[in-house]
């Protein structure tokens, strides 16, 4: 019960939320958030067919909340980067600029220090356009309606976390001891 209350303090869960569950039921983190917290707040739960089908399930279900492990996010990141590498030089440049400007926005929004950049003065002008073009596609990998992705089980690669946060993916790294749950 205490863990459900703590989750509720971190993520607002409502009856309109859809939780996508794909981690094993034996995973305490998954069970606490996906099952107990979702049920406590009347949220809907969808069960992924398997981790191998997670991309299709994200698109089909369009969840608002999910728990994951770093490997799943790293796989989605790698796939996105491979697709980007196939694009034109202009598309690659736009994506890089979107990541840089998005990271500065994330830092500003969260009170973190901002790395100096000559492009910083243009952020307010170009970020809405870049976000619509690039960020929306990245958020679309997660179904396009995600309000919280909780990643635990191991530490997430900093480059992956930074990229998704820069693209407006609502990602949170979480930590907890299974034996205290």
Model-found features: residue ranges?
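Glycine- and other small-residue-rich loops at beta-strand/loop junctions that grip anionic moieties
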Residues: 23, 127, 149, 153
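Residue-level signal for pocket-adjacent positions within structured domains
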Residues: 8, 18-20, 40, 151, ...
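Conserved AMP-binding/adenylation subdomain of ANL enzymes
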Residues: 2-18, 25-135, 145
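Conserved A3 ("GATE") glycine/threonine-rich loop of ANL adenylate-forming enzymes
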Residues: 71, 115-116, 147, 152-160, ...
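AMP-binding (ANL) adenylation modules
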Residues: 23-27, 176-179
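Phosphate/pyrophosphate-binding loop motifs in nucleotide- or prenyl diphosphate-using proteins
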Residues: 138
């Amino acid at each position: 019960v205490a863990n459900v209350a703590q989750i509720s303090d971190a993520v607002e869960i409502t009856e309109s939320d859809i939780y996508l569950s794909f981690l094993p039921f034996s995973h305490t983190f998954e069970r606490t958030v996906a099952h107990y917290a979702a049920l406590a707040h009347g949220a809907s739960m969808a069960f992924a067919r398997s981790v191998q089908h997670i991309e299709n399930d994200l698109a089909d279900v369009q969840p608002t909340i999910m728990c994951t492990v770093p490997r799943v996010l790293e796989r989605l990141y790698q796939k996105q980067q491979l697709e980007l590498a196939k694009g034109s030089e202009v598309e690659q440049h736009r994506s890089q600029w979107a990541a840089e400007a998005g990271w500065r926005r994330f830092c500003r929004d969260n009170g973190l220090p901002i790395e100096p950049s000559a492009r910083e003065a243009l952020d307010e002008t170009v970020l809405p356009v870049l976000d619509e073009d690039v960020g929306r596609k990245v958020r679309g990998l997660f179904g396009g309606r995600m309000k919280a992705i909780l990643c635990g089980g191991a530490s997430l690669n900093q480059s992956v976390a930074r990229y998704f946060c820069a693209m407006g993916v609502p990602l949170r790294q979480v930590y907890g001891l299974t034996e205290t749950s």
